[in-house]
Amino acid sequence: MFSFMNPGKSKPAKKGLKIIIVGCGKVGTTLVEQLSKEGHDIIIIDKNAKKVQEIANIYDIMGIVGNGASYSVQMDAGIEDTDLIISVTESDELNLLCCTVAKQVGDCAAIARVRTPDYSKEAGYLREKLGLAMIINPELEAAREAARILFLPSALEVNSFAHG
């Protein structure tokens, strides 16, 4: 396991949330970009050292190379005082395990990306039993949004209130 930080820069104390993002793919990188702009303290975890170093240098954040579901990796990332963990690796099972480990160790909110339809059907059960704040299926959400917009084709803007 290796940690990367942009050398030679002293970082001012951030006032936002401490957020761990597991997975440095497109979604993880986009989350880092958006959340770091909002002033949150971001730590990334991924097995790909090159990606971790690249993203850590671009956004001046801490990066850890390792398995995000590993207790020791999460401890190195500071899970005990983390506000939120978001797991967006390519593996649904790894995402669920990352969040489960985090919930057992720290008192943080946990969000897992789940793309398999079988798990998406059980999202409510998994969220409740694993104590997750949210389970997201991006493809399903995009399809729902498209259907909602197509249902009201002449609307300029479509907003949901309460639960839809």
Regions found by a protein language model. Give the residues of each.
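Cytosolic regulatory regions of ion transport systems
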Residues: 1-164
